[in-house]
From Swiss-Prot:
The active site is at residue 499. Mg(2+) binds at residues 698, 702. It comes from Bacillus subtilis (strain 168). This is Copper-exporting P-type ATPase. It is found in: Cell membrane. Its main location: membrane. Cu(+) 1 binds at residues 16, 19. Monomer at sub-stoichiometric copper concentrations. Homodimer at higher copper concentrations. Forms a heterodimer (electrostatic interactions) with CopZ during the transfer of Cu(+). InterPro entries: ATPase_P-typ_cyto_dom_N, ATPase_P-typ_P_site, ATPase_P-typ_TM_dom_sf, ATPase_P-typ_transduc_dom_A_sf, HAD-like_sf, HAD_sf, Heavy-metal-associated_CS, HMA_Cu_ion-bd. The gene is copA.
Length: 802
């Protein structure tokens, strides 16, 4: 079996959860497909398949055969370098082999190619790179039919259909008021009561406006299933057909005919269209987080090509291109500064409002803002490989994934419509044969009400819209959930295990204390200690040097250096003999240091690493270095405790140092002296105690523990491997994000339960009420139209969480 692949596709044409279930079932039956996940709210399909047995084209064809449409983008290119038809053939074959490309016909005569591709799998830069390798050049003409444009076009179409339907339905609604005693005083033009006039108004609504429902119903029935389209088409057709029968019966009579239901079918369709339009707009708002992230992306870049500056679309930037960035511009790609100095606003990544200084050799992140200087940047990551693209991809995957809680809704949705059809038929028979014997009008009215009040959409949207809104809002806080499953599991956590270095602490030692002794001043102590450390590459030595430089002190030139493993340094600088190290070093070199031991032990009790310093054989004092806790750690730990969580710090440090750091951070429980390879075992031990555990870390040695924990959280300032292993990435490196993630998970799960309760409760109560005859069909239709809207609007409340 070859290595499996995963493909994501945008699918249009789904109207309810039954549609999503049908596509999912159809895809899972395909040879070579091992799993398929179809999400109604995001209108996406994620398929895992064996490329040896099937491919993108076959999967797309299957979705089309089921009666739905895979949304693709088209990009038209001019081709440079073709000399014959064989060139065109080579380019066409190469483009069609790219994952996500549906079709790429090359026109040799016009020297153009129009590529139809899945934007979730391929990009313009992928297409260009593939053709570049063949020795040709693609030049973008312009893209059409993007997903956003297609959705706007569909929204405009829905609005136009709604207006057309409302204009024709209004006279029918006006005529309907004459049916009720309490509205009989309202004047109604006689023409509106004429059955043939009502027929003329209702027919375009039924067959022009209602046509998509007929098409959807036909496709569903052809595939031996049923969906909301079947219910709407059947219910409105029953009302229309019965009214048409009575209209023909009225031939030869004068005036209006009682018992017509033209207004029922027309108003039903109008209300359903109104509900669908609201739903579309609300669902669009649920992906606001993605839109905000995409707006951060630069649209163009200034590059040097053939010795000249050129402004090109961002998709055309290649790795190793030199990009010019002026003050105030967004940096278009991830790269390295090769020339220039500036301050860069990285708040979109780190959440920090203060700009960060950038010099030659420093890395920069695409979509951050160059504040005040001119920069030349060498492109390192472009297109879908940039940090922002990765963030967008993670959010999209999370919004398109299913949470385990959705399984119940999926199971119900799969059998919902057939059950409703059965109840509707039974309702008709009971009313026609028993409740109102022989009264066809009464029975058909109850039959229609049952059909149109049932709403599988509300059930299908209950979970995914909340997942979309919750994960999207979390992303705005710098919290990236890798999927709906992790968003759900996070709310069950009761224990948070924090790695010390880089998580609770800054991960970078700094000079904290300098205590001179005897005739020496602090300046002497620091200058000569730093001079000795210039020959060392130890992080503690680097911390001393950085601290001395920050104080503006000059460091004498080192003339001799010798490292004593496990003890310290022997050095000469500025004509002085210097020792920097442990008690053991001072004892071996016979330097009297007893008067410093009490202070040394005090500092060590605070979790600091203390080094004794001697100059020319005389104790000069001591310097202390510590990996200090982050400014936000204490507050973050307090927030976690307020949420009812048990907080544990895990570290490889000795217990004394660990206790000092834990005390400063407000952490009561510690696991100290743990080797990197033992961290996962400690997590497993906590799980055996019945704890739902999260591990939070930032380093390579945290990866096994992150994978073992129920939820692994990676601090975004850490290593790529930790972030790859984790279920949640906290891109701001702030421990407060842990509490935010847990709170967001709890609020999202609460929102999902509210939605499921509403959707299940609505259908459980609405269908019997309609069957008992307490609802007119048009009222039932209005309830159905707005039930799914209410679910989406409730989910959107998550976007306002602060």
């Amino acid at each position: 079996m070859s290595e499996q692949k995963e493909i994501a596709m945008q699918v249009s044409g789904m109207t309810c959860a039954a549609c999503a279930a049908r596509i999912e079932k159809g895809l899972k039956r395909m040879p070579g497909v091992t799993d398929a996940n179809v999400n109604l709210a995001t209108e996406t399909s994620n398929v895992i398949y064996d490329p040896a047995e099937t491919g993108t084209a076959a999967i797309q064809e299957k979705i089309e055969k089921l009666g739905y449409h895979v949304v693709t983008e088209k990009a038209e290119f001019d081709i440079e370098g073709m000399t014959c038809a064989a060139c065109a053939n080579r380019i066409e074959k190469r483009l069609n082999k790219i994952e996500g490309v549906a079709n790429a016909p090359v026109n040799f005569a016009l020297e153009t190619v129009t590529v139809e591709y899945n934007p979730k799998e391929a990009s313009v830069s992928d297409l260009k790179e593939a053709v570049d390798k063949l020795g040709y050049k693609l030049k973008l003409k312009g893209e059409q039919d993007s997903e956003a444009a297609a959705k706007k076009k569909e929204e405009r179409k829905q609005t136009a259909r709604l207006i057309f339907s409302a204009v024709l339905s209004f006279p029918l609604l006006w005529a309907m008021v004459s049916h009720f005693t309490f509205t009989s005083f309202i004047w109604v033009p006689d023409i509106f009561l004429n059955p043939w006039m009502q027929f003329a108004l209702a027919t375009p609504v039924q067959f022009l406006i209602g046509w998509p429902f007929y098409v959807g119903a036909y496709k569903a029935l052809r595939n031996k299933s049923a969906n909301m389209d079947v219910l709407v088409a059947l219910g409105t057709t029953a009302a229309y057909a019965y009214s048409l029968y009575l209209t023909f019966q009225s031939i030869g009579s004068h005036g209006h005919t009682d018992g017509l239901y033209y207004e029922t079918s027309a108003i039903l369709l109008t209300l359903i269209l109104l509900g669908k339009l609201f739903e579309t707009k609300a669902k669009g708002r649920s992906s606001d987080a993605i839109k905000k992230l995409m707006k951060l992306q630069a649209k163009t870049a200034t590059v040097v090509r053939d010795g000249q500056e050129q402004i090109i679309p961002i998709d055309e930037v290649l790795v190793n291109d030199i990009v010019y960035v002026k003050p105030g511009e967004r940096i278009p790609v991830d790269g390295e500064v090769v020339e220039g100095r500036s301050a860069v606003d990285e708040s979109m990544i780190t959440g920090e409002s203060l700009p960060v200084d950038k010099n030659p050799g420093d890395s920069v992140t695409g979509s951050t803002v160059n504040a005040n200087g001119f920069l030349k940047i060498k492109a390192v990551n472009v297109g879908k490989d940039t940090a922002l693209s990765h963030i967008i991809k993670i959010v999209e995957e999370a919004q398109g994934s299913k949470a385990p809680i959705q399984r119940l809704a999926d199971q119900i949705s799969g059998i919902f419509v057939p059950i409703v059809l059965g109840i509707a038929v039974l309702t008709f028979l009971i009313w026609y044969l028993w409740a109102a014997p022989g009264d066809f009008a009464e029975a058909i009215s109850k039959f229609i009400a049952v059909l149109v009040i049932a709403c599988p959409c509300a059930l299908g949207l209950a979970t995914p819209t909340s997942i979309m809104a919750g994960s999207g809002r979390a992303a705005e806080f710098g919290i990236l959930f890798k999927g709906g499953e992790h968003l759900e599991k996070t709310h069950r956590l009761d224990t948070i295990v924090l790695d010390k270095t880089g998580t609770v602490t800054n991960g970078k030692p700094r000079l904290t204390d300098a205590i001179p002794f005897g005739r020496f001043e602090e300046k002497d102590l620091l200058q000569f200690a730093a001079a000795a450390e210039t020959g060392s590459e130890h992080p503690l030595g680097e911390a001393i040097i950085a601290g001395v430089k920050d104080k503006g002190l000059e460091i004498p030139k080192l003339t001799r250096f010798e490292a004593k493993v496990g003890a310290g340094i022997l050095a000469e600088a500025g004509g002085k003999s210097i020792l920097v190290g442990t008690r053991k070093l001072m004892e071996s070199e016979q330097v009297e240091h007893g008067a410093l031991l009490a202070q040394m032990e005090e500092l060590e009790a605070e979790g600091k690493t203390v080094m004794l310093v001697s100059i020319d054989g005389e104790a000069a004092g001591l310097v202390a270095v510590a990996d200090t806790i982050k400014d936000t750690s204490r507050k973050a730990v307090a927030r976690l405790k307020e949420l009812g969580l048990d907080v544990i710090m895990m570290t490889g440090d000795n217990r004394r140092t660990a206790e000092a750091i834990a005390k400063e951070a407000g952490i009561a429980n510690i696991i100290a002296e743990v080797l990197p390879e033992q961290k996962a075992a400690e997590i497993a031990r906590l799980q055996k105690e019945g704890r739902q555990t999260a591990m939070v870390g930032d380093g390579i040695n945290d990866a096994p523990a992150l994978a073992t924990a129920d939820i692994g959280m990676a601090i975004g300032t850490g290593t790529d491997i930790a972030m790859e292993t984790a279920d949640i990435t906290l891109i701001r490196g702030d421990l407060n994000s842990i509490a935010d993630a847990i709170r967001m998970s709890r609020l999202t799960m609460k929102n999902i339960k509210q939605n499921l309760f509403w959707a299940l409760g609505y259908n459980s109560l609405g269908i019997p009420i309609a069957a008992l005859g307490f609802l007119a069909p048009w009222i039932a239709g209005a309830a159905m139209a707005f039930s799914s809207v209410s679910v989406v609007l409730n989910a959107l409340r998550l976007q306002k969480v602060k």
